């Protein structure tokens, strides 16, 4: 059997985050009544003339600048011929040559090492409508046509064939999605069709320079679906070649429920699309000032923010990965940090890195678990960044223990109450009076002769049983550090 290597290229379509469509004033709102967001332009009535949405051009150029593209100042549009029922004009307004953005790149991390994936282009185009094959759970034996999506602005990004595994494809899409969400140029919500990916997969014998027969895969509605589709298709192609067969250049459909790809149609070539200049949209030039202004709007991107979090706040790479996984989470963390800085507490002075680490841990563990369980995002959480900062401050200044803090956190999440109020109402203030803790420790020691004997014989872990008894007697309120300190002193002197 021959040894093959995988070659993957991605075509990523991202819906541009604008209120109106790219060539008309119709709304882009998702979930509207079918065919309610339409007009004579996006349904291609005779004589209707498209008018370019400036905000759509800004979004594409801004994305290109963030991904290190060269911006082509000469902007032209073309007609790409399609004969599908969801394209009412029988052509799509798109860009052929030149695209708005040429020759960009994106860094991904694979097995701890950075790899650069070169990107051929990003161009601006309009979306098609949508064929509906079921209503609710009822499958139809006919198709319905919803043109609400027709004419919505898209930016299509095309990579070079430099991705060599499904894992690299997954990381590329995750990194791209994160950057574009940070920029605000697309919401990239795959469930709503605001980010779609077509995958071109081929294999070739190891060492061969010429690319193998390319197969395009469509219909992936999640990033993990892209990964799974590539993995399946690579194995399918290997089986075909190893059995003496030949691969066909075709478009295949990913069937997620079956975990297979299925032949859809033969793959068109560029000639089949019969591109020609769009006569209703004249070419125009982008001023240098237009590009420069967009460049100024690009602030800190995810990788740079992650590096800063690690350097300035001393947090782990794991926590930094999670905290910068979306702009909303990163903003929440820094808002909470600023709130922590502004609190006048002696316990925070000179201890900011400890506070930053503790706060990061609470967001990436406790809060993250709640968000996952409720399937919500951090923007919808009941705990404000200011209130989480207050909770962390209560731990740091010794008012409550970490264990008690989890009880307080639960109530904060359920009822949106400030932590100080919960602590006061429930009498949860930590006992830090040494004389009070000493009395409880002495009681616990006298009631734990077996654990004391084991500790004295060298089994230092036996102290855990006595600590547990102290915490039980104090209803979890005793300061754990003081408990350990006093018990060690008493036991060593026993």
Curated annotation (Swiss-Prot):
Reaction(s) catalysed by this chain's protein: L-glutamyl-tRNA(Gln) + L-glutamine + ATP + H2O = L-glutaminyl-tRNA(Gln) + L-glutamate + ADP + phosphate + H(+); L-aspartyl-tRNA(Asn) + L-glutamine + ATP + H2O = L-asparaginyl-tRNA(Asn) + L-glutamate + ADP + phosphate + 2 H(+)
Broad class of enzyme this protein falls into: ligase
Cited Pfam families: GatB_N (PF02934), GatB_Yqey (PF02637)
GO biological process, one term: translation
EC number: 6.3.5.-
Keywords: ATP-binding, Ligase, Nucleotide-binding, Protein biosynthesis
Gene Ontology molecular functions: asparaginyl-tRNA synthase (glutamine-hydrolyzing) activity; ATP binding; glutaminyl-tRNA synthase (glutamine-hydrolyzing) activity
UniProt xrefs under InterPro entries: Asn/Gln-tRNA_amidoTrfase_suB/E, Asn/Gln-tRNA_Trfase_suB/E_cat, Asn/Gln_amidotransferase, Asn/Gln_tRNA_amidoTrase-B-like, GatB, GatB_C_1, GatB_Yqey_C_2, Gln-tRNA_amidoTrfase_suB_CS
Family: Belongs to the GatB/GatE family. GatB subfamily.
Function per UniProt: Allows the formation of correctly charged Asn-tRNA(Asn) or Gln-tRNA(Gln) through the transamidation of misacylated Asp-tRNA(Asn) or Glu-tRNA(Gln) in organisms which lack either or both of asparaginyl-tRNA or glutaminyl-tRNA synthetases. The reaction takes place in the presence of glutamine and ATP through an activated phospho-Asp-tRNA(Asn) or phospho-Glu-tRNA(Gln).
Record's subunit section: Heterotrimer of A, B and C subunits.
Record PANTHER family: GLUTAMYL-TRNA GLN AMIDOTRANSFERASE SUBUNIT B MITOCHONDRIAL AND PROKARYOTIC PET112-RELATED, GLUTAMYL-TRNA(GLN) AMIDOTRANSFERASE SUBUNIT B, MITOCHONDRIAL
Descriptive protein name: Aspartyl/glutamyl-tRNA(Asn/Gln) amidotransferase subunit B
UniProt organism field: Endomicrobium trichonymphae
């Amino acid at each position: 059997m021959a040894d093959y290597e995988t070659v993957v290229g991605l075509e990523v379509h991202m819906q541009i985050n604008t209120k109106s469509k790219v060539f008309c004033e119709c709304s882009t709102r998702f979930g509207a009544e079918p065919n309610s967001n339409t007009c004579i332009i996006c349904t291609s009535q005779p004589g209707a003339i498209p008018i370019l949405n400036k905000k759509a051009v800004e979004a594409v150029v801004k994305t290109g600048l963030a991904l290190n593209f060269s911006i082509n100042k000469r902007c032209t549009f073309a007609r790409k011929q399609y004969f599908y029922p969801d394209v009412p004009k029988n052509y799509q307004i798109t860009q052929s040559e030149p695209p708005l953005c040429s020759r960009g790149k994106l860094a991904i991390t694979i097995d701890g090492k950075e790899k650069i994936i070169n990107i051929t282009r990003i161009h601006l185009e309009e979306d098609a409508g949508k064929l509906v094959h079921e209503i609710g759970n009822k499958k139809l034996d006919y198709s319905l046509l919803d043109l609400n999506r027709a004419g919505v602005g898209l930016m299509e990004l095309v990579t070079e064939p430099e991705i060599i595994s499904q894992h690299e494809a997954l990381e590329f899409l995750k990194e791209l999605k994160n950057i574009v969400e940070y920029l605000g140029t697309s919401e990239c919500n795959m469930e709503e069709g605001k980010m779609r990916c077509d995958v071109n997969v081929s294999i070739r014998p190891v060492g061969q320079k010429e690319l193998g027969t390319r197969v395009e895969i469509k219909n992936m509605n999640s990033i993990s679906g892209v990964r799974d589709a590539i993995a399946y298709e690579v194995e399918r192609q290997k089986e075909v070649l190893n059995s003496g067969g030949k691969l066909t250049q075709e478009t295949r459909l990913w069937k997620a429920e079956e975990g297979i790809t299925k032949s859809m149609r033969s793959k068109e070539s560029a000639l089949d699309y019969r591109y020609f200049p769009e006569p209703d949209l004249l070419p125009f030039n982008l001023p240098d000032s237009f590009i420069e202004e967009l460049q100024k709007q690009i602030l800190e991107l995810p990788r740079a923010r992650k590096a800063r979090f690690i350097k300035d706040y001393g947090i782990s790479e794991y926590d930094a990965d999670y905290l910068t996984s979306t702009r909303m989470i990163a903003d929440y963390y820094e808002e909470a940090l600023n709130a922590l800085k502004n609190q006048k507490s002696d316990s925070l002075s000179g201890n900011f890195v400890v506070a930053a680490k503790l706060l990061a841990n609470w967001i990436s563990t406790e809060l993250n678990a709640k968000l996952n369980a409720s399937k919500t995002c951090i923007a919808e959480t009941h705990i404000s960044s200011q209130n989480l900062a207050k909770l962390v401050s209560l731990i740091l200044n010794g008012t409550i223990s970490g264990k008690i803090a989890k009880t307080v956190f639960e109530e904060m999440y359920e009822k949106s109450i400030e932590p100080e109020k919960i602590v006061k109402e429930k009498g949860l203030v930590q006992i830090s009076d040494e004389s009070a803790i000493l009395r409880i420790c002495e009681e616990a020691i006298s009631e734990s002769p077996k654990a004391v004997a084991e500790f004295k014989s060298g089994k230092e872990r036996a102290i855990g049983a006595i600590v547990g008894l102290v915490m039980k007697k104090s209803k979890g309120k005793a300061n754990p550090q003081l408990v350990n300190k006093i018990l060690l002193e008493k036991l060593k002197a026993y």
